């Protein structure tokens, strides 16, 4: 035999190269076949519940890396809870109604208005379900464990019915009303939009400064006075019915030199505006407060028969403009509020497609609203004082990426104002992570208007409202409950398939319909009402779930989206929030911190990562970043993550290989019988177990990542395993020293594998398949380890911390000797430590082979007073390094004075010779092969 065969060189088939792109699908198939999700749920039956409610992604297209961050985060939380004594079912969901699907069909050539509505809606449904299947496969490829067979989908009949019941409950409490308030109007979608459907972009717009002539100055202003107005939306001048001034602002009337006109404008802006208007000199003739100007009458700039009333408004500022804003109640929220309060007419001159209407005047009719600025300037004539291009933030339809307008049209609203304080009180009771989320959502609810819930589209849940002959809206509990029952049985498509009377309860009558005739609403609900009702359609509806949920986890954009709409509906119906805690995440940016976009070519798809690295690397990346803020990802970042994964994997592979002959039931050594350094590592590892368990409970993935990486690279690879291999390789297979270390190896291997399972389930399962002494078939069916504490552990940790400092100093001395060519490898060294009594006491207390721990062949501890002049000192401790005496033992690779050529043909030290002669007599008799 060969000499190396006398060494216990750990053997394992566990591969160094992970091959994740190929292996992960195999593991996922094995989990499906074994029905792991259901088995885990069955194991947890009767345990305390933890319910994370899945915010539904929109079912359109493959998932992006933001989806991956979110879904992996949820999976880590649910897996860790499931392995930590909680019944934690996870029901995934999809949002399936809305404009994007209509747009996809339109791009495919489907013409909605030229076909039967029921047929069109069926096409929408089929497409949505195809996208659900696509995304389900994408999420499963990430290794996400969920009830994939029973997801919630917002287009299913039972869900639609529960959504209608939420609406009915809100209507029954008087929270639903119809109004003609200005709403965000998307001409590109031909529909109203909610605030959550708006995004802002910087654009260039033409702003106009023009003047309205005073018609009735109320004894305050002369009729030859003109009030100077500013607008950034010239098309709205066609619907202007008032001029708003700040009640406490100071205004002046000025006369430019050479002009026959007087102009009123804010006093603080006179100089800047005079320069803008080309007034070289002017005279201030009178001063006025805004309150003094109230109810002065002016003429519309070109339609002089239309009067525009001066009114007061707190929204007027002097940050820009003239201190006076023209007021078109049909085209703005502030305009509407002050206009209604002062009896102004609400005029809308733009239709649903963005085209100017007949009431705008014959010159404007039929033109696109954004193209009429030249005509407005022409109509203003000499009343136009200046025109300039400004760059400002403007709202866009987040789906079509087209600008929107404010437009007053009859819509259905949910009144937030009626129960706003209840919502705010519930926010105060909710836990937020990060903490700033509480203030963000609080301020949003505090400042938001009522919620426009109607949409002028086809693909969605119909508003369950009927109209009597006299126009009375009917949405009583009796009616909405009946509609909900119909939806539960037939789906919401029944709304379009039946006449109004056939949708009402049998024999239904209403005093407003003496002839028994009814009409039904044709608008659908805002999709945020769909997803915002999920607490009722899912958490409150399924027996294995509970409401309110323990946790909602989504991107920070959902403060104005799902967090917001769910909170409103839940408080409206039941008086409490739908969640106990909210965790939000930032956006995923590219490696340079830029937003990802196809046009920039900087997008990274999960499928790309899976093909190149494997989903495990994406999962590990999720734990390596602070996702409460925006995070960065790139292929270079993922390469670094892959390198970290490799270190973790290879360390665990070493532990597998070097416990392959270890049976924990027969060979394990009790803690009190372990060596001193083994006890230290056991204590140290249990601290890591405690840190990781607490971090899982706090959803602090980064803390887990840091704890694992630090323990694997510093405590294990750079310390314990670095010298332990000299014991497990060299000592006799059954020696107490080797079994002590194998006990620690195996304990770390099993427990660390469990701890890593929520993050790296594929790798953990692969490792588990090599642990033949563990009972559970799959590691996902095991329980998380519980951290142990040991008597005197604080003192032990303190002693070893001091030793680790000494070891670092010794390594510096060895490095200097290496550089000076005194030694090559550290095993060639004889290290002398000139120790104080304190250091001697420490080394004695450790009760360990210090030479082994220092990875030197020979070590001497001398008195501090005896240090020679050529010693080197680090932090008060002196060292000398000499070449060790003796020859290299061919078996242990240590230099030992007892090393000599043996009769069986190898030069080994006495310790190795004793092992060879006891355990390998045949080799002793025959000699070793060269």
Swiss-Prot record:
Entries under Pfam families matching the protein: Anticodon_1, tRNA-synt_1
Known EC number: 6.1.1.5
GO molecular function, one term: tRNA binding
Chief location bin: cytoplasm
'KMSKS' region (motif): residue ranges: 595-599
Reactions catalysed: tRNA(Ile) + L-isoleucine + ATP = L-isoleucyl-tRNA(Ile) + AMP + diphosphate
Short sequence motif 'HIGH' region: positions: 57-67
Keywords on record: Aminoacyl-tRNA synthetase, ATP-binding, Cytoplasm, Ligase, Nucleotide-binding, Protein biosynthesis
Residues the entry annotates as binding ATP: 598
InterPro entries: aa-tRNA-synth_I_CS, aa-tRNA-synth_Ia, Anticodon_Ile_BEm, Ile-tRNA-ligase, Ile-tRNA-ligase_type1, Ile-tRNA_ligase, M/V/L/I-tRNA-synth_anticd-bd, Rossmann-like_a/b/a_fold
Compartment annotation: Cytoplasm
Protein origin, superkingdom: Bacteria
GO cellular component, one term: cytosol
Positions of L-isoleucyl-5'-AMP binding: 554
Cited PROSITE patterns: AA_TRNA_LIGASE_I
GO annotation, biological process: isoleucyl-tRNA aminoacylation
Family in the record: Belongs to the class-I aminoacyl-tRNA synthetase family. IleS type 1 subfamily.
Function recorded in the entry: Catalyzes the attachment of isoleucine to tRNA(Ile). As IleRS can inadvertently accommodate and process structurally similar amino acids such as valine, to avoid such errors it has two additional distinct tRNA(Ile)-dependent editing activities. One activity is designated as 'pretransfer' editing and involves the hydrolysis of activated Val-AMP. The other activity is designated 'posttransfer' editing and involves deacylation of mischarged Val-tRNA(Ile).
Domain-level remarks: IleRS has two distinct active sites: one for aminoacylation and one for editing. The misactivated valine is translocated from the active site to the editing site, which sterically excludes the correctly activated isoleucine. The single editing site contains two valyl binding pockets, one specific for each substrate (Val-AMP or Val-tRNA(Ile)).
Quaternary structure annotation from Swiss-Prot or TrEMBL: Monomer.
PANTHER family: ISOLEUCINE--TRNA LIGASE, MITOCHONDRIAL, SOLEUCYL-TRNA SYNTHETASE
Protein known as: Isoleucine--tRNA ligase
Name of the gene: ileS
